Every structure is written in C-alpha cells, then in structure tokens.
Amino acid sequence: MSQNLQLVIDTDVGLDDALALMLCLASEAWNEAKIHGVTCVHGNTCLENVCSNTLKVLHAAGRLDIPVFRGASESLVESPESRAEFYHGCDGFGDFQYPDAPDPDHHIQKDHAVSFLTKITSERPNEISLLCLGPLTNIALAIHMDPRFCTNVKEMVIMGGNIAGVGNITAAAEFNFHCDPEAAHVVLKSMKCPITIFPWETALTRTNISYRWRNDVLGKIQSPQMQLLNQAEAKVIARHYKDGWVQCDPAAAAILMRPSIASSKVTHYVMVELHGRHTRGAMVLDHINSQGKKHNVTIIESIDLNLYKELLLTAAKTNLSRSKIQKGQGEET
C-alpha cells in the first residue's frame, strides 16, 4: 500500500478515466493519498468536454474542492484526426443528461495545467506522484517549460503504449501514445523519475472482466459514484455486453494505489516511433539492447485480477465526499 501518496492526475476524462478518478478519490477517503489537483488534456474528446466530464465526476463524489486545471487542447505537432467518441460518446461521457452540471467557467482554475504541474513539483520536490491517463502533452510541455520538472517528480504511472505491436486505434499503436507521439517521446526520453507503464496489451488480456460482473455485481452497488458510472456506461454496456469489460485507466490507478496488484513486471528501455507510416505512435522495446542504454521504464505484464476487483468493489462502496474525509470516516458505508 502506498502511504501518504501525494497525487496529481493528468487525464482526458472519458468512461474508464472516471472510474480511475473514483479509485483515487477513494484512496484519499481512506487517508492513503492527497489529491493536489487534476490536470485536463485533449484525448478521448475535446478539451472542453474533458473539463466538463472531470467536474461531473467530482460533483457526483462531493469533491469539487479539488482544483481542476485546463491543459493542452491539441498535440505538440499533429493532432489526431479523430477522438474516441465511437466508444465514449460525443461528449466523451456516454451522452447522458447530467442535471445541475458544474459550470467550468466557475470551477476551472485560472492557472494553466502546465504552470500548475511545474509549480507543485518545484514546491514539493520528489514528493508528487503523477498518474497519467491520457496523451502526454501536458507533461511534455511541463518538461519544456521547466527542465527541473524532470527531476522534481517522484514517480509516474502511465497508461499508454504497447509491448507487442497490438494497437487499439491503428494497427500498431495504442490510443494515448498515438494521440501525441512526440509528447510520449519527450517524456520517456527526459524524465528522471521511476516510470511505470501499464500498456494496452496488459489491459486487453489481464483486465478482461465480464460485463455480467460489471453490471450485476459492481453495478448494483448503491453509491453516487456507481450511479454516475452506470449512467455514463449504459450505452457501452448495451452495445458490448457479450464482450469483455476492458478498463485501462482504473487498472493503472490501482497499481499506483496498491503496487501488489501488479503480479508480473519487467524493465526495458523503450522508445516511441515517430515516423512510421503504419507504426507512428507505437512503443518500441529494445529487447536486444541495440541502443546501449539503461532501462527507463517498468512495464506491467500481469495483475492479480481478484485483488483488483476487490479494490473496485471497496471503492464503489466508499463515501467519497469531503465532509466524510474531514471527519476521518472515509470507510465503507
């Protein structure tokens, strides 16, 4: 268990990001973490939708006190032609009507996400853990803005990249890295802290939970967070019920919160392909040490699915509201 996790979440909130955010909120309710802020980035949908979706999650959890920052709206070099609306919906969050949605103009911080990232890490050097759930544009910009950022961050957990050439947006690339390959390249090349990567293939093969469990076990829990997620995922559940419920981002969050959930991991030196016609955005593992460089990431190969599901269930039952945390009672209700 990670004690006193000082956390910043960089995210492109869609469906699985929302569940990851809920896990982080539960960790704070259990007095295991402190969320210093959420930085929004383009990805699953446009930046404005991401900001709105983030606020909806925090509103449902009773945690609008957490600062939310508007970040990069497009990639460093070439923005993707399409987002992930085909899965997450036109608004990136299931296209359901959310009553009394928080007004971004009122709740989003005035500072830019990149300014916040460089500031919080300079004020708390070697204390901040970054959970990166979307394209890495904000992180790359923080590196360019303040090179000390590379050494000020304590650790990073990244959902992104692939290890066996299996893509989910192109034939060879994972979505987050494909959205901004140059940003992924800058981050993996420049950061000096430990980096853990939860890649697409691990999500695909190791977090494949049945929709029956999602719907009839997790989905039956009566809590504000599950009511929100049930509404947001209703169309996806109806469309993919016979398939597996593959959720990338909450697994990455779970590994940061409970490192023991990672049952198999390996270190590698990795690179990002920037020019390939068919492979742009793919993560390349240097299996034969052709670059002669030290390993720069730890890759999660497998997780303990039972521990992961237990964590999801416990978080789904937890009272996430700020009033509960202030009373020191963030346990199951």
Indicate where each model-derived feature is located.
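Short, mixed-charge aromatic SLiMs
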Residues: 44-49, 76-78, 162-166, 270-288
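Metal-dependent C-N hydrolase catalytic cores
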Residues: 5, 48-123, 296-303, 311-317, ...
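A residue-level signal for conserved active-site and pocket-lining positions in enzyme catalytic cores
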Residues: 68, 187, 253
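Conformational coupling and interaction surfaces
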Residues: 2-5, 23-34, 175-182, 194-333
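Active-site histidine-anchored catalytic micro-motif
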Residues: 2-55, 63-64, 95-208
